[in-house]
Amino acid sequence: MIRIEKAQKEQATVIARLIMEAMNHECCQWFAGPNHSLEDFHQLITSLVEREDSQYSYLNTIVAITDTNEIAGICVSYDGAKLKELRQTFINGALAAFGRDFSDMNDETAAGELYIDSLCVNHTFRRRGLAKQLLEATIEKGRKMNLPTGLLVDTGNPQAERLYHRVGFVHIDDNQWGGHMMKHLQKQLR
């Protein structure tokens, strides 16, 4: 039995690993740069999950938990209107940790939607409907905020895109993020 609940600060290490998996390791290495490792990037993301003022904050995260209290999946989401303020901690952290300035990064969302930043199910728990459960819980969060729910999907990930369409997301426009072409999908309020 899986339960969906709000994340806890103590879960930051595992949440960070799943955020990195959602981003993909090539993208994480791009952010870390050639002089730093994925472990260095994991340390940064873990510190951001532990904070309350970060886009990756545990406060913005729900987790799928097994009967044995293992984290089977995560979904990180926040009000798109808060992107710039929440992303500033990532920008500051990357500058301090890697000497890289990402202040000119494209905006992946904007005001008017609950934005799903990261969705990932641990590989040992895939194909059990957990991603759909996490999406549905996040869509409900958006309804309570009176916001449609949006996300970006990599154009090279048709399997994820099919899942999003099955849940009711529709293509809004295109975007580029982390060096990848992405589709902006949105699930409207009903």
Regions found by a protein language model. Name each.
Residues 48-63, 81-85, 115:
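A short helix-loop-beta-strand connector motif used in the catalytic cores of GNAT acetyltransferases and
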Residues 63, 70-79, 115, 120:
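Conserved beta-strand in the GNAT
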Residues 78-114, 118:
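Conserved acyl-donor/pantetheine-binding loop and adjacent beta-alpha core of acyl/acetyltransferases
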Residues 26-49, 95:
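Conserved GNAT-fold acetyl-CoA-binding loop/helix
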Residues 112-114, 142-154:
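Conserved GNAT acetyl-CoA-binding A-motif
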Residues 80-81, 150-152, 165-184:
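Conserved catalytic-core motifs of GNAT/GCN5-like acyltransferases
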Residues 127-140, 165-166:
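Conserved acetyl-CoA-binding loop-helix of GNAT-fold acetyltransferases
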Residues 1-10, 27-30, 190:
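Conserved N-terminal entry element of GNAT/NAT acetyltransferase domains
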